[in-house]
Structures are given as structure tokens and as C-alpha cells.
Amino acid sequence: MKQFIVFILSLYTTLSWAVLEVTIFKQEENTFPIVISDFFVVGDASQGKVIADIMRNNFNRSGEFSVVNANYIIRSKPSFDKWKAKKIEAIVLGKLEKISKKIFNVEIELLDVYSKKTLYKDIFTVHNSGIRRIAHYLSDQIYHALLGKRGFFNTRLAYITVINKDKGEREYRLEISDSDAQNPQTILKSREPLLSPVWSPKQDKIAYVSFKNSRSEVFIQYPFIRRKIQKLPYFDGIASSPSWHPNGEILLLTLSKNGNKDIYSYQLSSKKLTRLTIDMGIDTEASYSPDGNKIIFTSNRSGQVQVYIKDLKTNKINRATFKGRYNAQAVFSPDGKSLIMVHKIDQDYRIALLDIATKDLKVMTNNQLDESPFFSPNGDMIIFATNQGGFGVLSVVSIWGRQIFELTSKVGEVREPNWSHYLK
């Protein structure tokens, strides 16, 4: 059945020089060999090649596939024996038909080389502005058909770029991009620091911290509609570390309104503020579990910097980390079974994965200054900020510990990454 796909456009300008450079680290073992053919195009259009190229890049970037370009257009049933001899396991065929100046039909078919069966097939009508989005969407569908789990391609990133200006000044930019770091848009520029951008569950807004009024305050930005930036009330003292409830209506905040940093929840519609932790220590960096029934936060209440979990139904607080003297910036995995965090080893800050049930802690990186880890929405990837040669970059590893790709900027340092949920 043909589907018509409508995609939301950002109100902000895409700047080619702001595109992050993606360095993919080759994966030699246990990858799935797949052919993605150039699309057969009906009418004068270059969009067929664009879709195929985006899809190839997506699968190469996944760390789970080795992608082969057929170097020619496969229009119908391919020679399965030929591809089987090359140890190819699946083939993607595509067709793009130009309906009008900016409207296209996009057909896709995924074939299993060994069974010779169609694993996925569909047709869509799409506007020219949605070409990139349909390529990501189709990548997710094929990923699921082959591996039985959701992909992460039809998602977005948010991050902060820091640019050194003349006379020692700096410019801070809140930026967003597609998951492949393409289609970047600068949402906000500031001479004062910007921190902690975090997508709402519906991907319609971003909460972040700004020092524009010479103090740490939380704001909400709407990238895709014309709406004024929303500033949360001034709560006295510091406001930091925003994090969304799964319903998108509540924010977790770190506030020092009573002289000490504690965790609060703030209901956006009712403006109700609720204190969730009361301790003489510093409580900060809180985030919700996927079901919204628990929060995780960093605290020095034990005399060390450790991670704690609070059950919001029972109000019981349990310490989650015991290995090492410093564990911080933890977030739940999408299935709620694991935590990703910053773990200190000697003088190095690295990314570590904790199994909540078994308490098994696995160090994922071998860097010196890792920070701000966050899961991809399918839970298979972890994006984080790190330092390479004194320069801030973003890096992505799989939950199996393989470095997949790195994101760098030509114009400045990149920090504070956040990965959106799935786009609707």
C-alpha cells in the first residue's frame, strides 16, 4: 500500500560549513554483508542516488554491516547465485519516480540472497524536503527486517559547539543534526556558556542550560515551530541538569534554592515544583527511568561521588555503584536494565556500562576525559564527548565495546551530545 510521508522541517538554516565530519572505524569481524543498489530513476532526478548513498552510509555507520555497492542499478530479480558466491546475504533494490517538480514515489525491496525471498517491500510518496528522512526511515525498516530489532537512523542529535573568537572570546552554539551528523542547524548562538541540551520524548523541544543572565538557568527551545523560547522560573540559586519525564510534561532539575543542590521535578503546565531528594550532600545529574517510576542521580552523600537510584513510588533510595571512587552522569538504557556513566580509573575519566541486576561494570573506552554519555534509542550505541589532542569531539561506541565512529567539527569543539527518541 502506498503511503504519503510528511516530514517536519526546521525553521533554522542549514550551514554546510557546520557539518560535523564523520570518521567511521572499519569493523572487520561479525558484520552482515549487504548490497545496496543505486536506485532506478524514472524522470530527471538525482534523489535516487541521494537515498542510496544515505542508506549505505547508515549501514556502514551501524558497525553491524559491511556494505557493498553493486556499481550498477539492479532493476529486477538479481542473480542470487552470483551474489551468494561473493558471500552477500541480502540485497536492497530501489526505484524513484518523479511525479511532479517536488513529489516522488519511492519504492524499496529487500531480498534474502539464500532463500530468494522478499523480506521487506513498500512504496511511499514523498516531498523533496523529505528525501533524507525517507532514507533514514527505510534504513530503519531494513535494519529491523534483517536483525529483528529497531535501528537508530531516523533520529536526531543535539550538541553544543564552542568556537574561539577574537580577543579570547567564545561563541556557544546549540545545534541539531540528523543521526548521521548531516543536515546541521544552529538553533541558538550565545556569548555565554550553553550546557546540557536534551530532547523531549516527542522531539518537539529541547531543554538546555544557559548563563545568558549571568546565572545558570533552564530554557526550552522549539526547533520546528515559531514559538518564543520558554524560560523556566528563577528558583533562587543554581538551576541545572534538565531531564525529561517520558510523558514530556515534567522536567527533572538540580536546584540550589535551599542552599544545597538537590533534585526537583517541575511540572510545566501547573508550574508545580516538587523536591525529590533531601540530603546534606550534593545531589545532581538526575534522569528518569524509561517507565518514569524511578530516577537516577549523582551524589557525594557517601563521601564519594556515586550513582543512586530512587523509587518514586516507595521513595526508597539505593546506591547503584560500588566499583571505584567516582561514578557520575548516569542515564538509563532504553530497556531500563543498564546504566551508562562516567567512571574514573586512576586519573582517567572513561565511559562504563553497568548491569543494574548483576552490578557488573564494563569499561567501554580507553580515553582520558570522557563525559556526557547517552544511549541511542535502540540501546545499541552510546554517544559521548571526549578530548582528542586537546580538542573536544564526539565519539560513538557500541554496547559491545567497539568504537564505531567519531564526530568532529572544522570550526570548533563539540560537546554535550544528546540523542533523540524515534521520530514520529
Curated annotation (Swiss-Prot):
Protein family (similarity comment): Belongs to the TolB family.
Identification of the protein by name: Tol-Pal system protein TolB
Gene3D superfamilies: TolB, C-terminal domain (2.120.10.30), TolB, N-terminal domain (3.40.50.10070)
NCBIfam families to which the protein is assigned, alphabetical: propeller_TolB (TIGR02800)
A Pfam family matched in the record: TolB_N
GO CC annotation terms, alphabetical: periplasmic space
GO BP terms, alphabetized: cell division; protein import
UniProt function note: Part of the Tol-Pal system, which plays a role in outer membrane invagination during cell division and is important for maintaining outer membrane integrity.
Gene designation per UniProt: tolB
Signal peptide (UniProt feature, chain positions): 1-20
First-listed, main subcellular location of the protein, grouped into a coarse class: periplasm
Subunit structure: The Tol-Pal system is composed of five core proteins: the inner membrane proteins TolA, TolQ and TolR, the periplasmic protein TolB and the outer membrane protein Pal. They form a network linking the inner and outer membranes and the peptidoglycan layer.
Localization in the cell: Periplasm
Keywords: Cell cycle, Cell division, Periplasm, Signal
Coiled-coil ranges (or none): none
Domain of life of the organism encoding this protein: Bacteria
